[in-house]
Amino acid sequence: MEQVSSSSVTGELLEQEAPPSTPGLDWSQLPADLLIRILGTLEIPDIFSSGVVCRSWHASYLEARRLGICSNNPGPCLVFSSSDRDPSVATLHSLTTGKDYYVTMPDPPFRTRYIVGSSHGWLITADERSNLLLVNPATQAQIAMPPPETIANVKIRCNGEGMLDGYDLFTMDMSSRDFDDEAEPIDLSWEEGRFYFYMRVVLSADPSSGNCTVMILHLLHNLLSFARVGATHWTWINVNELCWNYHDVLYNDDDRLFYAIRGNGDVHAINTNGPSPILRVVLDAKNSLINCAKYIVLSESGDLLQVWRYYHYVNNNKERRTRELVVYKVDLVEHKLVELKDIEGHALFIGFNSSFFLRVEDFPMLTTNSVYCTDDTVHYIYHSRFGFREVSAFHLENSSFTDLVPIGSRLNWPPPAWFRPSYSKESKVLCCVTS
């Protein structure tokens, strides 16, 4: 791997035509201090556009970034690949403006990547060799995480001629915390591995901060492993026999802990700050396994919430859609779940992204008390890579759905995901990229 510095956004990075100029006006002569103040009020995708109009505007754009006055409450975007664009270009559809923005990503081409997460303005992707790459579309910074073969239950496989041939995925015995010698490993190609290694990926912080821990939820049996940016291997969380069957993870900045939800609704708090991970049971749900996807979310007031997502198949079993969503508050005093129909004027975004709330009063184009969803079911995506992809809003008050974002040129691979653009906190970042 080689060390490179992140590049600034230039005309080559944003492929959007500038609007025609007004006769008699030279907008390049707009005073820099006024332009910088204007840039501070714009959504980040619009700042992309402004920064490539001309040299003087680009200089003001760089100064606005340096001063840190760009929006710290960016609106939501749907990121996807468009059939009428180059494979390296990512489309950002802003729900705030209704516009599409086009950003050329660093190699490997965006259309070959599998989006497995988004957080802190970074997309979390896996390439065709199943390597995990963190990339910031705004700064073009890219960071490579430890290779898949350093995950506890993954080994590189050789064929009969001794040539590297893919991955072997082993079952782990939770009682012995070791390989299950009686179970045959699953043979995976280089590309197939990413569907098994990254069911969920969560960041503790902006990766450019130098203090970011990355948590992955992986098969078999929905295990958790973590690594810090710059580390060489993944550490398996195997504190006890309960460390499996996880569905989702979040990071809480306030107490610097990860919170993970299991298939039966149990919630575990996980401390990765010391030499060895420490686990504490926050909620013992005492439920049997319920057949739905479960998300764990932190509200603005600091409450832990669970979202249970039920699916069904439609159109002759060709399309998998959400049938219902139920939101619960975790009552840590009574140790029970309390159903919510009102999320207090917010909209909630779930999918491969780290779940987040937005105040509808700040983004009036959103619908209050609604859950905005994208597809994130790995086995369905694996078996139907170019099939239907759900992008919808579920309205809690009347249990109805609204389909979002007309398909147009939108492709279903990589799977569309929610994303909030952001600039790295550091203006210059040293990051690892694959050579």
Language model features: what each stretch is:
Residues 85-91, 130-133, 222-225, 265-270, ...:
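Structural motif
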Residues 108-315:
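A sequence/structural signal of beta-propeller blade repeats
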Residues 26-27, 32, 76-78, 121-122, ...:
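Tryptophan-centric aromatic hotspots in well-structured domains and transmembrane helices
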